[in-house]
Every structure is written in structure tokens, then in C-alpha cells.
């Protein structure tokens, strides 16, 4: 037993603690303007979301094994599931999983069987999501095949050829919009994937679903995505939530908890955990997933957000994302950053390095893909632009390498912010 005195400093008063915490937090870099997405987006969160989600009944609640005694919690999950089904155009949704990446991996696990086990993933999907799917598949021994991208979207001809040669494809994961912000050809993808007997998994940005075709309209079998845009702050990467929804024929393979509506002994509306026989606490090692407790508080936030915004409010926010992203892209083009892709996009887009602009002295050299010197110059130029933006309190886009930058615009970005960022870019491009 340790009996010596502990080498601890003297206690601090409350005022001193506040000063110390402010000193520590002052070391953080806080950006006033954000133009970066790549999976986590800076959307406005109505005040009612924090107000409801901070109630102690929700913060401390846990769905016990006798879940039906927690009718309030079950109802919030049921309402969340209902809204996710409406948003995705699917028949059933679960109570959520950890995040968008694990939702995609769980969806891939739903599709595998003894005859079909190969998982196909578009290279135009988010690299972090791809890595999580690969990690899950490594544990189960399922083969993973990457589908090449062409001009920023999934190569349809390559996908059709690969699926025809395989014959054992379990599923194909496509992201809409994809990692580069571009819209995929959903109808053509559905025909190719289902024509090969595979399942179609569509990863979605829930904000984009307010204005784009739903996965259900595209004919997808499973819709997944990260619910962060639905009322979750950026918060250094979490906690977020992964939403999952599926067609009725896949419902019994959904992982995690599903809340259903029924009537109690008095004939009144009641909520229960349904289809529990497929879950790990009953099926044990035969279950397709081991998730049980999930992101229920985050799902509550998403439910409150969707209720507060409504269909019209979400469509308005999504419409602003679309319009402002196009304005900012044009301002960056004027400043000297050339868009890399010409396809339709939602609120994210990629620009090439400033040295690739038409009419620059280095244009011909940069066309030579083998020129390491040119690639290094591009990367340095892109880094210089992002550092200049940071010095102005602006978080620029995500560097993709070789001077390419993935930009994001949401309803939070004002015209003044976009003009200011473009002015900084123009100044730096002139100095390169």
C-alpha cells in the first residue's frame, strides 16, 4: 500500500480554474469561416436541438433490457426512424450505428452470403469510409475490389466489366454525392449492379437528400450515411451517428435495434423493440453485427433537427448550399484556381493548383504527369494558399495532393466570407 504523500499542486479556487481553462483553450485555432467538408459539414443548428437534447431524461437515459418501460426514449427513436425512411425513400431504418463509415461497413456485411461475398467499392467514395469497410471485410475474410473512377465519378464501363467477370459480387458501394462532390449516374449504376445480381448500397449526404433523388428512387437496396449534418456540431470529429435504411426484403438483416409501433393491453399506442431475434444478445455469434447500444442521443438530435427544419427548411438550406457553392467556385476561378471536374455537384468541388491555370508559364510542364518537379511546385502553391487563408482566420479546403483542393460551401458561408477568401487566394496566386 502506498503511504507517501502525493506530489500534487495546491488546489485552485473557482476563478483560478476558469483562468487556467481559458489559457489552455486559447491555444486552440478557432476559425471564423470554414470552407472544408469531406465528410463533416458546418451547418446551422437551431437552438431547440441543444435545448431538447440537453434534458437530463435524454442525456442519462439507456434503453434497458425491459425497453418497453422507456416509452419516451422508444418514441424518439421511432420518430427518428420514420424521418430517415422519408428522407431516403426506404422501407425500414434502424436506431442508428456509430457513424457513416461503420454504417457502410455494416451494410456490406448485410449483403454477403455463402455464394456471394465480394464487396465492390467505388474509388470516388470517401477514403475514410473505404478504409473502414476494408477493415470490417478483413476480419470476415470477404474480398474487397476497388472500382476505378473516371473524370471524378465511378467508371461505369469498368464496373460493368468487373461485375460480369466476377459472378460473385455481393454488393457495390457508391457515394452520392461522391467524395469530390460530384453526382453519380444513379439510374445507370442501378441497372449495372442489379443486372449482375449484386446489392446496391448508396452512401448519402442527408442534407443533399432534401433536394436530390432519394436512394429509394434510384433503386438502391440499402441507404447509409453520416447523420452529422442533421444537428451535430463538428466537435473535433464526434460524436456523430450513422443512419441505415433498407428495402423491406433486407429489413431482417439490418443491424442494431429497431423500434416498432404496436398497441398495449389497453389498446393504446405503444412502442417496442422489434425483430430482436436477429440481434447479437440473442443470436450471439450468428448475428451479422455486434452493435447494441448506439448513438441514441445523436439520433435524438437528428430527429429534433429534422422536425424543427421541416422538409421546406431543409430544402432551403440545401438550395443555399448549391447556389453558394457555385458562386464561390466562380470566384475562385477568377482568382486563378481552375475547377478540375465539369460534372454536376452539390456543395463540394475540386480545384487544380494555381500553376495549372490557362496561360501560365508552367502550364505545359504541368501537363507532364511524370514531372515530379511540377507536382512539387503545385503542392507548395496549394499549401501556400491554405496557410494564407488560415492567417486570416479562414479554414480553406482539404488538400488532396499536387495542389488540388477540395472545397465545401454551406448555408453558413456568407457572400462577404466567400469574397474575402477569394481575395486572399487571388493575392497569393499573383505572388506565385
Regions found by a protein language model. Name each.
Residues 230-335, 339-342:
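Active-site C-terminal subdomain of aminotransferase-like
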Residues 65-69, 85-105:
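Short loop-beta-helix segment that forms the pyridoxal 5′-phosphate
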Residues 31-34, 94-95, 141-147, 313-318, ...:
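Flexible, glycine/charged-enriched surface loops at secondary-structure junctions
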Residues 312-420:
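Conserved C-terminal alpha-helix-loop-beta "cap" of PLP-dependent enzymes
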Residues 1-78:
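N-terminal entrance/gating region of PLP-dependent enzymes' catalytic architecture
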Residues 2, 55-67, 85-89, 115-116, ...:
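Gly-rich Lys/Arg/Thr-decorated short loops/hinges at beta-loop-alpha junctions or inter-strand turns
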Residues 102-268, 335-336, 340, 351, ...:
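Conserved PLP-enzyme active-site core in the AAT-like
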Amino acid at each position: 500500500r502506498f503511504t507517501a504523500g502525493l506530489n500534487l499542486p495546491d488546489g485552485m479556487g473557482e476563478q483560478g480554474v476558469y483562468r487556467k481553462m481559458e489559457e489552455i483553450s486559447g491555444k486552440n485555432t478557432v476559425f471564423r469561416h470554414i470552407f472544408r467538408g469531406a465528410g463533416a459539414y458546418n451547418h446551422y443548428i437551431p437552438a431547440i436541438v441543444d435545448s431538447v437534447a440537453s434534458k437530463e431524461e435524454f442525456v442519462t437515459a439507456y434503453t434497458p433490457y425491459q425497453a418497453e418501460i422507456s416509452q419516451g426514449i422508444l418514441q424518439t427513436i421511432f420518430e427518428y426512424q420514420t424521418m430517415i425512411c422519408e428522407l431516403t425513400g426506404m422501407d425500414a431504418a434502424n436506431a442508428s450505428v456509430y457513424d457513416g463509415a461503420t454504417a457502410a461497413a455494416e451494410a456490406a456485411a448485410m449483403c454477403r452470403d455463402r455464394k456471394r461475398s465480394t464487396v465492390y467499392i467505388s474509388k470516388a467514395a470517401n477514403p475514410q469510409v473505404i478504409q473502414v469497410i476494408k477493415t470490417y471485410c478483413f476480419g470476415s475474410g470477404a474480398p474487397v475490389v476497388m472500382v476505378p473512377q473516371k473524370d471524378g465519378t465511378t467508371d461505369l464501363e469498368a464496373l460493368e466489366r468487373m461485375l460480369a467477370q466476377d459472378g460473385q459480387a455481393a454488393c457495390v458501394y457508391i457515394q452520392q454525392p461522391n467524395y469530390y462532390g460530384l453526382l453519380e449516374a444513379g439510374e445507370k449504376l442501378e441497372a449495372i449492379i442489379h443486372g449482375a445480381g449484386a446489392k446496391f448500397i448508396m452512401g448519402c449526404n442527408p442534407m443533399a437528400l432534401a433536394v436530390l433523388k432519394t436512394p429509394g428512387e434510384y433503386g438502391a437496396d440499402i441507404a447509409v450515411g453520416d447523420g452529422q449534418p442533421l444537428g451535430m456540431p463538428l466537435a473535433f470529429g464526434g460524436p456523430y451517428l450513422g443512419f441505415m435504411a433498407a428495402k423491406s426484403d433486407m429489413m431482417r438483416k439490418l443491424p442494431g435495434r429497431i423500434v416498432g409501433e404496436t398497441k398495449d393491453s389497453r389498446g393504446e399506442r405503444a412502442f417496442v423493440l422489434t425483430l430482436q431475434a436477429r440481434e447479437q444478445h440473442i443470436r450471439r455469434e450468428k448475428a451479422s453485427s455486434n452493435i447494441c447500444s448506439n448513438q441514441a442521443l445523436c439520433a435524438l438530435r437528428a430527429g429534433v433537427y429534422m422536425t424543427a427544419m421541416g422538409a421546406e427548411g431543409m430544402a432551403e438550406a440545401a438550395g443555399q448550399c448549391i447556389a453558394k457553392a457555385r458562386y464561390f467556385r466562380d470566384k475562385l476561378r477568377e482568382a486563378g484556381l481552375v475547377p478540375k471536374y465539369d460534372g454536376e455537384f452539390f456543395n463540394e468541388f475540386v480545384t487544380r493548383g494555381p500553376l495549372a491555370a490557362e496561360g501560365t508559364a508552367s502550364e505545359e510542364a504541368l501537363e507532364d504527369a511524370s514531372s515530379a518537379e511540377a507536382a512539387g511546385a503545385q503542392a507548395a502553391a496549394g499549401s501556400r494558399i491554405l496557410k494564407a487563408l488560415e492567417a486570416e482566420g479562414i479554414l480553406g479546403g482539404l488538400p488532396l495532393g499536387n495542389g488540388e483542393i477540395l472545397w465545401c460551401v454551406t448555408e453558413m458561408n456568407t457572400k462577404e466570407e466567400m469574397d474575402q477568401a477569394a481575395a486572399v487566394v487571388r493575392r497569393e496566386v499573383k505572388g506565385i
